[in-house]
Amino acid sequence: MSYQQQQCKQPCQPPPVCPPKKCPEPCPHPQCPEPCPPPKCPEPCPEPCPPPSYQQKCPPVQPPPPCQQKCPPKSK
């Protein structure tokens, strides 16, 4: 006997009793959400990158030393 034939010999089961169909309930009115929370302050900006190291090594520019040589007075 094949599997299908065995299935055929089993007594039929009564169809399940479906519950009576309910009309779908109308959608409830959308409720206003809670008031918006105050906007979060953005994270503080990250510190700007330090200047590249080669800029830090430069000595500050100094004015040239005053001339030691005494110039002769200009003739008019």
Swiss-Prot record:
Swiss-Prot/TrEMBL Sequence repeat ranges: 21-29, 30-38, 39-47
Conditions for induction: Up-regulated by estrogen in the uterus of ovariectomized animals, with strongly increased expression detected in luminal epithelial cells at 6 and 12 hours after hormone injection.
Cell compartments where the protein resides: Cytoplasm
The keyword Cytoplasm appears for this protein: yes
Coiled-coil residue spans: none
Keywords: Cytoplasm, Keratinization, Repeat
GO CC entries: cornified envelope; cytoplasm
Residue ranges of the region described as Disordered: 52-76
Main location: cytoplasm
GO BP annotations listed: epidermis development; keratinization; keratinocyte differentiation; response to estradiol
Span list, region 3 X 9 AA approximate tandem repeats: 21-47
Signal sequence region: none
Tissue: Expressed in uterus.
Pfam families cross-referenced by the UniProt entry: SPRR2
Primary role: Cross-linked envelope protein of keratinocytes. It is a keratinocyte protein that first appears in the cell cytosol, but ultimately becomes cross-linked to membrane proteins by transglutaminase. All that results in the formation of an insoluble envelope beneath the plasma membrane.
Family under the similarity heading: Belongs to the cornifin (SPRR) family.
Protein name, UniProt field: Small proline-rich protein 2E
